[in-house]
Curated annotation (Swiss-Prot):
The gene coding this protein: lon2
Annotated source species: Sorangium cellulosum (strain So ce56)
Family statement: Belongs to the peptidase S16 family.
Pfam families associated with the record: AAA, Lon_C, Lon_lid, LON_substr_bdg
Active site feature: S690, K733
Family matches, as NCBIfam families: lon
Name of this chain's protein: Lon protease 2
Amino acid sequence: MPTGDPSSRTPPSPDADSVPILPLRNSVLFPMSVVPINVGRPRSVRLVEDLLGRERALVGVISQRSPDVDEPTFKELYSVGTVARVVKVIRLGPNNYSVVLNGLGRFRVKSAFSLEPYMRARIERIPESLVRDVELEALGAGLREATREVLGLMPNLPRDTAGILDNVREPGALADLIASNFPQAQASVGDKQEILEAFDVKARVRLVLAMVGRQLEVLRVKKEISSMVQEEMGKSQREYILRQQMKSIKEELGEGGDDDEIEELRERIRRAKVPAEVDKVVRKQLSRLRSMAQQSAEFNVTKTYLEWIADLPWSKTTVDKLSVESVRRCLDEDHLGLEKVKKRIVEYSAIRQLRTDKKGPILLFIGPPGVGKTSLGKSIARSMGRRYERIALGGVRDEAEIRGHRRTYVGALPGRILQALKKAGTKNPVLVLDEVDKMGVDLRGDPAAALLEVLDPEQNSTFQDHYLDLPFDLSQVMFLATANNWDGIPGPLVDRMEVIEVPGYTRTDKLGIAREFLVPKQLSAHGLTDERLEFTEPGIEAVVDHYTREAGVRGLERQIAAVCRATAVKVAEGNDVREVATPEHVEQVLGPHKHRPEIAERTLQPGVATGLAWTPAGGEILFIEATKMPGKGNVVLTGNMRNVMQESASTAVSFVRSKADRLHLDPEWLKEIDLHVHIPQHGTPKDGPSAGVTMFAAVASLLLGAPVRSDVAMTGEISLRGRVMPVGGVKEKLLAAHRAGIRHVLIPAKNRRDLEDVPQDVKDQIKITMVSSMEEILPLVLEPPRRAPAQSASPEELEEQAGV
C-alpha cells in the first residue's frame, strides 16, 4: 500500500494561485498517496514535457466525470481535485510517459483560464482540519479496526501491511490512505470522488467506514463460501454481495459473459410477452440456469429451451388486409380459374371485417398434381398480407415431426409446426401442410393422429408441443392442407377440415395459363425476351394438344422450358436469332407428337369401348377390349383388375347373357364360346365400379358385331337389374374426355348435380347424356354392324335393343 510522508500534510504554498491541470480518468488521486500514472494524451504530454527539469513541480490532478472523453474541457472534470508533486518522470516511448505523483492536499477550482497548450486553472487550497474530539477519535478507531479485519481476511498481503495503519494518526489522513488503495471493483470513481469532496473529516471517515464495511462483508461471505458454512443470510444485502462475488469470480475465470447472456435472454422473453402460465415456467428455468456451471450439459439444454421460448411469436401478429376487392384482385393475378377456392377466401375476408376475433379457417385442397394447390397458399398469404410457410409432410412417419421430441432426448427440438411459426415470426401465418395424404405409420406413431389436435379449432388454442411442454395458441393460424386423393387421409382428419376440390384445368385454362404465366416465366428464367423468342397462339396450342396430357400444368411448363432452352443455346453461341414458336418450330424442337388421337383407330372394331376413370393425377380415358374364342362359356379377365372391377366385369357379362333373347343371341352359342375382357396397361392396377357401363357396352358390341362409336365415352356402375348407379369424379372424367377429343359422354342420371362444377366451355363442347338404365345405352353408343357375326342381331334388329 503506497504511502506518503505524514509531515507532508502541510504542503508549501505555490508561488501563484494557478497550477497546470492534469486530467485523470478511471481513478482518483488522494492526499497521502504516491501513484504512477501513464500519460499519452496530447495536452497531458505537453504538460509533462513542460515540467521536465523542474524540481518539486506541482500539478493539479482532477478526475474526469466520464472516461470516454479523450480531450476533456473543464465541464467534463470534477471541481475538486488534489495538488500533487511530480516525483519522477519516465519516458516510455514517443509521446508516452509514466509520471509518479505524490498527493499533497485538496483544492477547488476557482476559475479556468487556459486549455492550450495544456489546461491551467486558478485554485483554492482546502486546508485540512486538525481539530480532534471524542467522536472523531471513535470514528478513526472504528475505521482502523475494520480495516485491520479486512486485511486479516486477505492472506496474500505482506505481514507488515497492517503496521502502516499505526503510522497514520490523523483520522482524515487515514481515511484518504484507505480510500486511495481501495480496489476499483468495490469503489467506483464516483464513490471515491465523493470521499475526496468530503472536506468535513467526520463525514469523510463515515463514508470510508461504510465502504470498508461493505468490503468486510464481502470477505466474510467469501470465507463462508470457501468453508461451505451454510448460514442463513440477510436476503437483500447478502444476495447482492453474492452476486457481486460471483460476477467477480466469473470474470476472473473468463466466464463473465454468462450473466449478460442470461440477462439478455430474460429481456428477450420479456419482450416476447409470454402468457402468465409460460412466464412462471420461464422464471423457474432462468433461476436454474443461473445456478448451473456453463460446462454442464444441462446448461446448454436449458439455455436452448429458453431461447426457443424467446423466439416463438407468442403475441406478434400481422394485420390482415381485409379489403374484399384487394383480396380478389391478388388471387386473380396469381391464378386463372379456381373460382370455388377464391370464393371461400373472399368469404373469410368479408367475415373478418365483421368479426375480428374469427378463428383461422382450416381448408383441405384435393386435386391432381400440378393444378396449383401449394402455390395457392402463397397467393392467399399475399392477398391477406400474412406470412407464408410450408411444411412438407410427404413420407413423414414419426409423430414427433409434428409434436416434437421430449427434452429428455439428446438433440431434442420442437415439431415442425412450432419451427414454422418461429420462422414466420408471427402467430397468424398461412401454414401449408403439403401432401397430407402421403404420411405413413410405423412403430414411432401416426403423424396423422398428431394433426388431429393441430387442425381442431376447438383444441388448437392450447396446442402442446412435447419439447416446450407449454400451451401455444394456434387458433389464429390459417391452415391449408393439400392432397392428391382421399385414400391416404384418415376420416377423423378429413372431418376437421373444409374440403375444397381443385380440379384439373381445361384446354382453355391451360392455354390462358401458358400465355399469361408460363411463357413469361420461362422466358425470364432462360434470359430471353419476346424479341428473341415469340410464342404464337397456334404454337402454344400445339404444345398443349400434342405434348402434354395431364390435369395440371407442370408438364406443360417443362415443354415450354424445352423450347426456350433450344433458343437459349443458339443465343449463347453468339447467333443473332429471332425465333417464332409456331407448331412447326415446336415439333422441330420437341420431336414427334407424344400424344395422338387414338380414339378412332382403337374403336373401329367391335368389342372396344371407351371408358372414363378417376386417378389421383386427374381424370383419364381407358379402353376396355373384349374378344371371343371357342370354349365353354368361361370369362377371362386381364389387365391388372382388382376385385371391385372384376365383379363389375362379371356383372356385365351376366347381364348380357340374361338378356340373350332380347339381344337375339343364341344362348347355346354363348355356351360354346369363352369371353376375354382386357384393359390395356398391365402395369397399372385398376379398380372401382365405374367401368361397369363400359364393360357392358364392350361385351355387347363384340357379341352383336357392332362397333362402339369412336366419339363416345361412358362411366357408371351397373347392377344385375339393369340400373345405372352414380359414381364419383364426374368433373375430372369430363375434363379428361374433353382433353381426349371426346364429343359425347354418357353419365348416370343421378350425377346430374355434379355438372354444376364442370366449366361451361366443357359443357358447351361435349354432349352429355344422362342414363338411368342399361336399356338406354346400346342405341346411343353402337354403330351399325360392319358385319353380322354368327348368331348376332341383324342391323334391323338393333333398333329393337332399346327395350333390352
